[in-house]
């Protein structure tokens, strides 16, 4: 039997995505065995991020600075904008290092079942960014789900009439698949094979 404090830590870790009770228990045991080399640095990193965490007012990414590191990077191609549903999608795509541009996070996807409407997402901010000019291409990188494709179709309608080339990730992506669960090779192929919308 373990103390209530250790059990509380296991329960907190088990609440994280991808960690069940067994994995959380193993993680806690590892942290306790490697107390000096693992526990203290993890605690310090969590504390630092917790204190400095902000949402980028330009793109919606989560970082410790505003604007985020991607928006502030002058080497990024500001003429190319990739629209994603969630921050996890941005991180998955950016990890592939194949998209040289900047991003825009919607904060979800349209869903009649879940009651998510256009005004619940960062769509107006996207239209404002495009209307401001300087963007040549908008890549709609929605998940290959019914809601994702509905969102992409809605965005294509909202951006119609602006002088931008609309492209969409190729659908070698599995239907029903989510970007943050895909391997880098699949994401790379989808980015390379993007095609015009409509």
From Swiss-Prot:
Gene Ontology BP term (one): DNA recombination
Ranges where the Toprim domain occurs: 79-174
Ubl conjugation as UniProt keyword: no
Keywords, in A-Z order: DNA damage, DNA recombination, DNA repair, Metal-binding, Zinc, Zinc-finger
Zn finger residue spans: C4-type: 56-71
GO molecular function, one term: zinc ion binding
Domain of life, per lineage: Bacteria
Listed HAMAP family: RecR
Similarity remark: Belongs to the RecR family.
Role, per record: May play a role in DNA repair. It seems to be involved in an RecBC-independent recombinational process of DNA repair. It may act with RecF and RecO.
Protein name: Recombination protein RecR
């Amino acid at each position: 039997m373990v103390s209530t404090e250790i059990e509380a830590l296991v329960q907190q870790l088990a609440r994280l995505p991808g960690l069940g009770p067994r994995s959380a228990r193993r993680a806690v045991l590892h942290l306790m065995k490697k107390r000096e080399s693992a526990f203290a640095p993890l605690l310090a990193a969590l504390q630092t991020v917790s204190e400095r965490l902000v949402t980028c007012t330009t793109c919606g990414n989560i970082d410790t600075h505003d604007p985020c590191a991607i928006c502030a990077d002058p080497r990024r191609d500001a003429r190319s904008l990739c629209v994603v549903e969630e921050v996890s999608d941005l991180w998955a795509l950016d990890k592939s290092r194949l998209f040289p541009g900047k991003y825009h996070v919607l904060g979800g996807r349209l869903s009649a079942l879940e009651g998510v409407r256009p005004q619940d997402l960062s769509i107006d901010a996207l239209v404002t960014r495009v209307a401001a000019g300087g963007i040549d291409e908008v890549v709609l990188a929605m998940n290959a789900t019914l809601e994702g494709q509905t969102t992409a179709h809605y965005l294509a309608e909202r951006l119609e009439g602006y002088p931008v080339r609309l492209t969409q990730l190729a659908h070698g992506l599995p239907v029903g698949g989510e970007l943050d669960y895909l391997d880098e090779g699949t994401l790379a192929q989808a980015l390379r094979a993007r095609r015009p919308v409509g």
